[in-house]
Amino acid sequence: MDNIEQRVKKIVAEQLGVAEAEIKNEASFVNDLGADSLDTVELVMALEDEFGMEIPDEEAEKITTVQQAIDYARANVKA
């Protein structure tokens, strides 16, 4: 597990109140981890803060799983 993946999972755990060990990469924020629409907005904001990036709304709507969040962060994080 790389640093970005660990950081994303830590944020997901903190935002959704789920144990990090229970977070699978393919898990859906809504269907598997119990997030509602407010949770997903807060999750996107936390990812933006953690990685120092801006996630446009149309992109944020496409991030529905842990792996998609990891992939987005990897592609857009400023090294």
Curated annotation (Swiss-Prot):
InterPro entries: ACP, ACP-like_sf, PP-bd_ACP, Ppantetheine_attach_site
An individual GO BP term: lipid A biosynthetic process
Domain Carrier: 2-77
Alphabetically ordered keywords of this record: Cytoplasm, Fatty acid biosynthesis, Fatty acid metabolism, Lipid biosynthesis, Lipid metabolism, Phosphopantetheine, Phosphoprotein
GO molecular function annotations of the record: acyl binding; acyl carrier activity
Modified residues (O-(pantetheine 4'-phosphoryl)serine): 37
UniProt pathway: Lipid metabolism; fatty acid biosynthesis
Its biological purpose: Carrier of the growing fatty acid chain in fatty acid biosynthesis.
Protein name, UniProt field: Acyl carrier protein
Organism in which the protein naturally occurs: Burkholderia multivorans (strain ATCC 17616 / 249)
